[in-house]
Amino acid sequence: MGRKSSKAKEKKQKRLEERAAMDAVCAKVDAANRLGDPLEAFPVFKKYDRNGLNVSIECKRVSGLEPATVDWAFDLTKTNMQTMYEQSEWGWKDREKREEMTDDRAWYLIAWENSSIPVAFSHFRFDVECGDEVLYCYEVQLESKVRRKGLGKFLIQILQLMANSTQMKKVMLTVFKHNHGAYQFFREALQFEIDDSSPSMSGCCGEDCSYEILSRRTKFGDSQHSHTGGHCGGCCH
């Protein structure tokens, strides 16, 4: 009986430790989501004036955006990505994409030309993935006239900066394998790695999946992926 009782206590203690670890993860995500402007502490990153561009950058929750700006972001995403989605197992659905982009948890970086014309954006969230606190990048979309001028890379660097400042463990994103330009951009130019949770690594569907999950660790990320009792895709509410 003593051995059985000891094992039960060990299991209970392990559950308590896992719960405490997940509570700590969720506390960091909640703290990040309570910020008024995650970019406020980094004013130098609110301007991009290189390679012929001169844009201002702001960070807002989706609830703080004008409806016209949300419509622009959706239309740009559809223009840039609908064909890519239709070539995947996901397909393109206007309603589902709009719901994703207007979710209460959504944050946006918006790049403005002349302070009034939106030319690029990133949709991201502070969330929990596989037990880790992360900044998940859902979209980085640019108008054609501002591409290949370093702005997309600059927006991702801002995400990495904010992930570090909020003590997230990594920046994550999903990219289609057949979107060769984007895949090469993230893997080579930005040094993202295939995440342990990606289908090709986890073995859930491997080569049959049309996408990879990529990630880049912050200074708070462990050298190896660790599961702390959370589940992939989870959030703290």
From Swiss-Prot:
Annotated residues that bind substrate are located at 85, 127-129, 138, 174, 197, 211
- From the UniProt record, list the reaction(s) this protein catalyses: N-terminal L-seryl-[histone H4] + acetyl-CoA = N-terminal N(alpha)-acetyl-L-seryl-[histone H4] + CoA + H(+); N-terminal L-seryl-[histone H2A] + acetyl-CoA = N-terminal N(alpha)-acetyl-L-seryl-[histone H2A] + CoA + H(+)
Which Gene Ontology terms cover its molecular function?
histone H2A acetyltransferase activity; histone H4 acetyltransferase activity; protein N-terminal-serine acetyltransferase activity
Asked if the keyword Cytoplasm belongs to this entry, the reply reads yes
Which of UniProt's keywords are assigned here? Acyltransferase, Cytoplasm, Lipoprotein, Myristate, Nucleus, Transferase
What family is reported?
Belongs to the acetyltransferase family. NAA40 subfamily.
What name does UniProt use for this protein? N-alpha-acetyltransferase 40
The protein's organism comes out as: Mus musculus
